[in-house]
């Protein structure tokens, strides 16, 4: 169960990071809305409050994030899981909190993660991720992860930092998507389920070079519902936050897992992360 949980957290974070790091121009066709594109008859005040179409919002967000050099993201993930294996059943709650400081080029990431699973001691992990190494601290011990174990993960992280047409994937669910506004933010809302969300996740993960294990996990999923909410600042057109709620089930090796999950991510410190310095004890662990 823990392996499945960890894999799925990474899948969701890859999508979330890609949305904040996108640097290409997309041409997604917006769904039908009541927001006409013509300004005829509108007063200046009306024009100022007009909600952009999906295409306009994606284009402006791409332009803004292309110039962004660094940012911080924080995520909180709550999962309620039920595992059935024959006549045995197990319920488990998992709470994960994650904070990442990210410099895009050259890629440098510092992250702190805490995972709490019911009935187990909380696990705290600190990591520094560069373009070719991962230094990890569990407890008081720093270790340099062997290159053979990190190469694929680093390539996936690089792809998420500079995706090719990442938001273009939302065309696959445009009939389930609408643009609204809340306070200082524009909001992209998507309510999807079944094959639509599975195809969206597959397309994004294939583009980010996800491994065979992640693809196999997606093939086994039956997602009954998934709601996504992307908040984009009206003034800067930079991502502000994302909310994801999902109910899904999957089977593997005769075991059936049902999961109810809520994930909230926030983005801040745009262009304010100036330096990430790896501590000497972490560097010494690679010697």
Regions found by a protein language model. Give the residues of each.
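Subset-of-secretome marker
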Residues: 21-287
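Positively charged n-region of N-terminal signal peptides that target proteins for export
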Residues: 1-5
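Sec-dependent N-terminal signal peptides
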Residues: 7-12
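C-terminal motif of bacterial Sec signal peptides marking the signal peptidase cleavage site
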Residues: 16-19
């Amino acid at each position: 169960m823990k392996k499945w949980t960890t894999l799925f957290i990474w899948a969701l974070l890859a999508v979330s990071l890609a949305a904040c790091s996108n640097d290409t121009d997309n041409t997604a066709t917006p769904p039908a809305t009541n927001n006409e594109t013509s300004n005829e008859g509108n007063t200046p005040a009306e024009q100022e409050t007009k909600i952009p179409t999906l295409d306009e919002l994606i284009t402006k967000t791409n332009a803004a994030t292309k110039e962004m050099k660094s940012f911080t993201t924080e995520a909180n993930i709550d999962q309620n899981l039920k595992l059935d294996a024959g006549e045995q059943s197990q319920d488990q709650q998992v709470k994960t909190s994650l904070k990442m400081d990210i410099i895009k080029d050259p890629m440098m990431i510092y992250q702190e993660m805490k995972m709490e699973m019911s009935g187990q001691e909380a696990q705290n992990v600190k990591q520094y991720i560069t373009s070719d190494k991962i230094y990890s601290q569990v407890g008081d011990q720093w270790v340099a992860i062997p290159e053979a174990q990190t190469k694929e993960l680093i390539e996936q992280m690089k792809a998420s930092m500079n995706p090719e047409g990442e938001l273009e994937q939302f065309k696959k669910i445009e009939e389930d998507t609408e643009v609204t506004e809340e306070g200082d933010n524009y909001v992209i809302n998507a309510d999807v389920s079944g094959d639509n969300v599975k195809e969206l996740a597959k397309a994004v993960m294939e583009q980010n070079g996800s491994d065979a294990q992640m693809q196999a996990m997606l093939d086994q999923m039956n997602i009954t519902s998934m709601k996504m909410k992307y908040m984009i600042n009206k003034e800067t057109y930079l991502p502000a936050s994302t909310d994801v709620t999902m109910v899904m089930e999957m089977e593997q090796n005769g075991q059936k897992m049902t999961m109810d999950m809520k994930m909230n991510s926030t983005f801040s410190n745009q262009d304010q992360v100036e330096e990430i310095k790896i501590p000497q004890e972490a560097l010494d662990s690679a010697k």
